[in-house]
From Swiss-Prot:
It catalyses: (2R)-3-phosphoglycerate + ATP = (2R)-3-phospho-glyceroyl phosphate + ADP. This is Phosphoglycerate kinase. Substrate binds at residues 28-30, 45, 68-71, 125, 165. The keyword Iron does not apply. It comes from Methanothermobacter thermautotrophicus (strain ATCC 29096 / DSM 1053 / JCM 10044 / NBRC 100330 / Delta H). Its main location: cytoplasm. It is found in: Cytoplasm. GO terms for cellular component: cytosol. Pfam families: PGK. Disulfide bonds: none annotated. InterPro entries: Phosphoglycerate_kinase (IPR001576), Phosphoglycerate_kinase_CS (IPR015911), Phosphoglycerate_kinase_N (IPR015824), Phosphoglycerate_kinase_sf (IPR036043). One of its GO terms (molecular function) is ADP binding.
C-alpha cells in the first residue's frame, strides 16, 4: 500500500529559512538510564532526533535543544549532561550542556550562539510549571515561555512522542514564536494520518498489552467510525473481553484486573462485544503458567493460574487474519514477551505482520521494543516513536502540540 501524501495545516522545516536564526527545537530524548551512575542504556531516541538537529546545524541555525528526562519522583529523573555527551558523539560535533533552563545562564548561552552551534538546556521538567497540564493559552504565559520567546526566531516541535501532552515547552512557544514541525514529527504524522485517511481493506487492528484504557478507547473509535474491519484482542485486553463474554478466567487473573483498577472495563468490553460481535475477536485458548511452565488451555477450561500469553490455536487464527489484511495497526504485546516461554504469541503475531502484504504500523511502546528485539524492525512499514501520541491519534483525539503548530503565526 502506498500512503497518499498528506497536506498539513502547519509549516515544516522546508518552509522556513533558518540560517543565522536562533531556533528552539523541542525533542523527546527521554531514555532508559542506569539509576546508579546515570549512564544512558539506549540512545535510540537521540539517534532519531539527531536528523532534525543535524539538519538545523548544517543549515546554519543557532540551535537550542530542549528536552525532558523522566518525571519528578522517578529514580531516572536526572540532568541532561549525559544526553549532551551522547548527542555530541552521534552528531560528531559539540553539543554544549547548559545547566539552566531559562535563567540568566541559559539566556546568555542562547544569545552567544554562533551559526551552526548547538546547546542543550537542562531537563525542562526540573521546572515545576512544566508538569502542569493546562490549555496552550495559559502555557504561553508561563515564566519559561515569556523568558525565552524574545530570544527566538523560530520554535520547532519534533517531540511527536509527547505531542498528546499540553505542557509549556510543547504548546506554549508556538503561540508566541513562528513555529514548524521537525522531521520526526512530520514523518510520524505523514505516515499515521496518511494511513488513517487512506485505509485499504480489510483493515485489522491487533490490540493488546496492559494499557486497557488506551486499547478500548482506540477500539471504540475505529469500530464506530467504520475504519476497522476487525479487532484481534491479546494480552490483558483479551482477558478483560473474555471476562466480559462470561468466561471464567480464574481468581488470580480477576485479582490482577482489580489491582490495575480495570474492573469497570469488563462491562465496557461486554457492551462493545455485543455491539460488534463479528468484528471483535477474542482468543479461543490461552497459555498459563503452571509450575513455572507454559501450558496451553482452551478458554472454557482456564485454571486458576496466571494467563501469560495467547494460545497456539489463537495464534494460528490471528496469523491467518493478519496475513489477509491490507492495512494493519498493532499496539501492545500478546503476552509476557520478556519470558521466552510466553513470547511465542508476540513473536508469531509480529512475524505475521512483517510477512503480510498489507501496510503495517506499530504504535510504539512495548510492542515496538519487542519488534526491534526480535528482529522485525526492517520488515514492518512503520514503528512509531510515540506510544501515547499514536494511541491518541488512533483514538480520534486531538494532539495539543499539533493544534498549536497549526495556529502558529508567521510573518
Amino acid at each position: 500500500m502506498m500512503v497518499i501524501p498528506v497536506s498539513f495545516k502547519f509549516k515544516t522545516m522546508d518552509d522556513i529559512e533558518v540560517t543565522g536564526k536562533t531556533v528552539l527545537v523541542r525533542v523527546d530524548i527521554n531514555s532508559p538510564v542506569d539509576p546508579n551512575d546515570g549512564t544512558i542504556l539506549d540512545d535510540t531516541r537521540m539517534r532519531l532526533h539527531a536528523e532534525t538537529i543535524r539538519e538545523l546545524s548544517d543549515r546554519g541555525a543557532r540551535t537550542v535543544v530542549m528536552a525532558h528526562q523522566s518525571r519528578p519522583g522517578k529514580n531516572d529523573f536526572t540532568t541532561l549532561e549525559q544526553h549532551a555527551r551522547a548527542l555530541s558523539g552521534i552528531l560528531r560535533r559539540p553539543v554544549k550542556y547548559v545547566e539552566d533552563i531559562f535563567g540568566s545562564a541559559a539566556r546568555e548561552n542562547i544569545s552567544g550562539l554562533g551559526d551552526g552551534e548547538i546547546i542543550l538546556l537542562e531537563n525542562v521538567r526540573f521546572y515545576s510549571e512544566e508538569v502542569l497540564k493546562r490549555d496552550p493559552e495559559e502555557q504561553a504565559e508561563t515564566h519559561l515561555v515569556r523568558k525565552l520567546a524574545p530570544l527566538l526566531d523560530y520554535f520547532i516541535n519534533d517531540a511527536f512522542a509527547a505531542a498528546h501532552r499540553s505542557q509549556p515547552s510543547l504548546v506554549g512557544f508556538a503561540l508566541r514564536v513562528p513555529s514548524a514541525a521537525g522531521r520526526v514529527m512530520e514523518r510520524e504524522l505523514r505516515t499515521l494520518q496518511g494511513a488513517l485517511e487512506n485505509v485499504e481493506r480489510p483493515c485489522v487492528y491487533v490490540l493488546g498489552g496492559v494499557k486497557v484504557d488506551d486499547s478500548i478507547m482506540v477500539m471504540k473509535n475505529v469500530l464506530e467510525n467504520g475504519s476497522a474491519d476487525l479487532v484481534l484482542t491479546t494480552g490483558l485486553v483479551a482477558n478483560i473481553f473474555l471476562a466480559g463474554c462470561g468466561v471464567k478466567i480464574g481468581k488470580v487473573n480477576m485479582d490482577f484486573i482489580k489491582s490495575r483498577g480495570y474492573c469497570d472495563f469488563i462491562k465496557v468490553a461486554k457492551k462493545l462485544k455485543k455491539r460488534f460481535p463479528e468484528r471483535i475477536v477474542v482468543p479461543v485458548d490461552v497459555a498459563v503458567c503452571r509450575d513455572g511452565k507454559r501450558v496451553d488451555v482452551p478458554v472454557k477450561k482456564i485454571p486458576n493460574h496466571p494467563i501469560q500469553d495467547i494460545g497456539m490455536e489463537t495464534i494460528k487464527l490471528y496469523a491467518r487474519r493478519i496475513r489477509e489484511a491490507r492495512t494493519l495497526f498493532a499496539n501492545g504485546p500478546a503476552g509476557v514477551f520478556e519470558n521466552p516461554d510466553f513470547s511465542i504469541g508476540t513473536e508469531d503475531i509480529l512475524n505475521a505482520i512483517s510477512s503480510s502484504e498489507g501496510f503495517s504500523i506499530i504504535g510504539g511502546g512495548h510492542l515496538a521494543a519487542a519488534a526491534v528485539k526480535m528482529g522485525f524492525e526492517d520488515s514492518i512499514n512503520h514503528i512509531s516513536s510515540g506510544g501515547g501520541a499514536s494511541i491518541s491519534l488512533l483514538a480520534g483525539e486531538e494532539l495539543p502540540a499539533v493544534r498549536v503548530l497549526e495556529e502558529s503565526r508567521h510573518p
